[in-house]
Amino acid sequence: MHTNEHTQKAETFIVPIGPQHPALREPGHFEFTIEGEIVTAASVRLGYAHRGIEKGTESRNWVQNLYMLERICGICSHIHATAYCLGVEQLAGVEAPPRAQAIREMVAELERTHSHLLWLGEAAHEAGFETLFMYAWRDRETVMDILEALTGNRVNYSANLLGGVKYDVTGEQASKIEQGLDYLEERTRHYLDVVTSDPVFIQRTRGIGVMTAVQADRLGVVGPTARASGVVRDVRVEAPYAAYTAFPITPVLAQAGDLEARFVVRLRELFESYGVIRRILANLPPGELVLKRMPRRIKAGEAISRVEAPRGELFYFIRSNGSDTPDRVKVRTPTLCNMASVLTLTVGRHLADVPMILVGIDPCFSCNDRGLVLKRGADHEHWTWDRLRQIGLDYYAGERGSGGVGGTSISPAPLPPCPPALLTGMHV
Amino acid sequence: MISDLTTLLFFPGGLSMLLAGMAFTWLDRKLLARLQNRLGPRWFQPLADMVKLLAKEEVVPAGVNRLLFVGLPVVALAGALTAVLYIPLWGLPPAASFPGDLVVTVYLLSLLTLCTGLAGANSGGRFSLLGATRTLTQLFAYEAPFLMALMGPALVAGSWQIALITAGINGRWLLFTQPIGFLVALIGLMGKLEMPPFDAPEAETEIVAGALTEYSGRGLALFYLGRSVEMVLGLTLVAAFYLGGLSNPVAFLLKTLGLLLFIAIVQSLMARLRIDQTVGLWWRYGALLVLLQWLVLWGGRWL
């Protein structure tokens, strides 16, 4: 996707990180050229966790897709379902009732809380600060318990329906959530204090991976990564969806643009989330949870749905041809937008800062992997679906020997098998 | 002859030392875990790890010097076990002693780090090489301040012989008269054992397992054992030098465990330092502060 080729020396020392590496929770491949301890060039290859979900949506109906798209990400599952529901509702020309919208927003903010606390632990672990890691994840259990009490699930909450939500909030649950939030607020204040005052930790974060507002704008970063560089980029504010008009949030900004700012922004965002959840609980609009009637076939048309996932802007493009299945669903997750910043910011830094800078964008590889570009030298032709299918069949036939797949292997090698080295770059 | 063999193989060297090392490792891991709000390992976990590792196949990477690859862990453990003889374990007088054995002991304790570095350089993998570079860089960072910190009590006792130093201290707690030396010695020991925050040489999120990345089975077990033994030796040395010299074994064990608790707390409090930060810390503060301590000691003599 992006390669800085500074080094032409023969004795370049490349540190491969991934696809299997303790710093990565998911498969991705980075190559860092280093001199001593300093990174001089960086490149990335994504696509290891491509699951064919977009293609999969085309063979499932509108309702079934809700459950599959929710499984794109294990951490921000609710926001994917929300983006999809909002898009489909837009296509169908309906709108979920206000109570449902408010509950959508509340679950989304609870999810953000869980995601940011998870990230805090993860980032502390990359810095070798195991104690903070363990404590952050212990406290994250509080919000997981809240989500479980609310929806019955800790991870894939399935709170959304086309045209509404599945779960209501009872008074008992509301008081339990309030209690949990009080505890979390106190803990978050403590963590904010730790990351801004612990001298050893600050040595690893302050002034490291600095991205100016101009750079952030040029690299097109989104979410907390952009906001830590002083760029106001928050879909909740720019284009309010769900109930964000009735229950607005204030975007949290920091100007420093370094790793410390990314910690501060994410932690201060938690206070925003706690505040808005409290306001929603206190002023939950009355009414239905779900529309009386949601069409099974969606009118032909195209819709774009943007929401603010914990990591930044999540983008859905949905096209319907009037049938009960989508014609095309396109998902762009925030990690993709932020990945280029990692490559830019790591060059010139210590190797020890690399995992920190990488985790600073809160990467989520499998959410991000949509497919691969097959590059063969100067061959830039567009391949048809049939040709691509044939390449795939031949590739696996070559791997399994002469047997072939379903007898489709006609000649020994109509196209040479495509070794992984040729699968470079990444296609959105 | 039989008594010499017993000394070497059972007590205080050899088997008892390996068991003590594993016990201390367990306690360190357990304390750290409890401080980090985790459950931590069961009491026999280090033993179980050793049994498992020793029983496993040792994979030797292609293209390495096989003799070095297999031999280095043995040398590392042997170095640590030899140092046992000169150290007043459990508050008892050392099993062997000669003038200048302090320097030899410190050298023997460094052997483990040296062997780890060589093992990493020999393995040929990229993570191993980086780990080896960092291990050796760190050795040059903490070794001099560590040795200088151990020389403080030697200056007081006017001897380079561990037995004479502990006798010369004669129950005085140098911790109170030489607090800087005490801290530098203890923190230097953490650097030697590559404990957080000095675990850059084996930072798993950057270079997997550092110098020992390619090691498995027996070699890894021996390196781990060497490190465990060295932890006991280092803590004993600091306790003997700074916490009142020789005393009855129970009191001495308690002092050693107190030091272990201290390093467990320090480990749990800090994030990992980058290797350049580690070097900077030792030379900018560690070495200078110990020098200051020396000047105070010398000044005190003339008063």
Regions found by a protein language model. Name each.
Chain A
Residues H2-V428:
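Active-site bordering "gate/hinge" segments
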